[in-house]
From Swiss-Prot:
InterPro entries: ACP_syn_III_C, ACP_syn_III_N, FabH, Thiolase-like. The last Arg residue of the ACP-binding site is essential for the weak association between ACP/AcpP and FabH. This is Beta-ketoacyl-[acyl-carrier-protein] synthase III 1. It holds the Pfam family ACP_syn_III.
Length: 323
């Protein structure tokens, strides 16, 4: 008998420290007016010095257990998507597993930058459809603030910290299947390589690429990609499911920049009321943004929802779901 994947619970968490635009304007060449005009962002949340990615992810995992009524021992897999892990090793997912006492679960991290939640959902779906795993957590968590160069306004004003996640469960009822279709892609030739957080781990990386421990992005290129290539992927996936954009209850995009979301909405000829967003309050929380926005509207879902995200790699993915 075939096994299907049902999305049964969502959770989200942001750390308590709120940073508004004026606070950033006090330490870099920017202003509240400039940030809001170019990004739509008003505030973002930053983790405390002793608060790590695993701490945020653990908060979400505990919410998923509470909402589902499952014991931690019932979890088979914990998959954490992040580009700000607590360490290179062990996986942040392993720390979450220990924190919640999910002794029967195996755990690993997935790195697909801001596309992590869509890649994570698609990956978890395959584990469940194998018939061997019943209860899977996919948690996207980031502490981007610890990776910022606060002299670089082209990056620092965008990012915030947060976590969101989903509980996926096996079902033999095809009517309960939540993951309808997916399209995941990468363009490695568009990658900007730098040594980043791992520092120059090879002589080639140390010699040939820009040296920085902070995030680095080419904003104009990302904007162009996100507003042209990504909508093409979205349209193709919608058509493959024999739907039209107007059939969607919601479209939840990567929370990179409100202006990008507005351009995608115009491209699909859909009103912004169909685009739940949190970027204005939380900033770009990387892979967590889509999960957090979905968590906000999860209890209201009655129709199909398109999730789409894009990030470094370039990695980009769209997943069509229903509750």
């Amino acid at each position: 008998m075939p096994t299907y994947t049902k999305l049964t619970a969502m959770g989200q968490y942001v750390p308590g420290r709120v940073v508004d635009n004026d606070e950033l304007a006090a330490i870099m060449d920017t202003s509240d007016e400039w940030i809001q005009a170019h990004t739509g962002i008003k505030t973002r949340h930053y983790a405390m010095n002793d608060e790590n990615t695993s701490d945020l992810a653990t908060q979400v995992a505990q919410q998923l257990l509470q909402k589902s009524g499952l014991a931690a021992s019932a979890i088979d897999l914990i998959l954490v998507t992040t580009i700000t892990p607590d360490a290179l090793t062990p996986a942040t997912a392993c720390l979450v597993q220990a924190n919640i006492g999910a002794d029967n679960a195996f755990a690993f991290d997935l790195s697909a930058a801001c596309a992590g939640f869509t890649f994570g959902l698609a990956t978890a779906d395959k584990f469940i459809r194998s018939g061997q795993y019943q209860n899977v957590m996919v948690i996207s968590a980031e502490v981007n603030s610890k990776m910022m160069d606060f002299q670089d306004r082209t990056a620092a004003v965008f990012f915030g910290d947060g976590a969101g996640g989903a509980l996926l469960q096996a079902t033999d009822n095809p009517d309960e299947n939540s993951l309808i279709a997916e399209k995941l892609e990468s363009q490695g030739n568009a990658t900007v390589i730098h040594s980043g957080r791992v520092r120059p781990i090879t002589e080639v990386a140390a010699t040939n690429y820009p040296q920085t421990d902070a995030f680095y992005q080419v904003g104009r290129d990302v904007f162009q990609f996100a507003t042209t290539v990504v909508p093409e992927q979205m349209r193709g996936l919608i058509a493959s499911a024999q739907l039209t954009p107007s059939d969607l209850q919601y479209v939840i995009c990567h929370q990179a920049n409100l202006r990008i979301i507005e351009k995608i909405a115009a491209n699909l000829a859909l009103p912004m009321t169909k685009f739940p967003h949190n970027v204005d309050h939380y900033g770009n929380t990387s892979s967590a943004g889509v999960a957090m926005a979905l968590a906000n509207v999860f209890d209201t879902l009655t129709g199909p929802v398109l999730l789409t995200a894009f990030g470094g790699g370039l990695a980009y993915g769209s997943v069509l779901i229903k509750k």
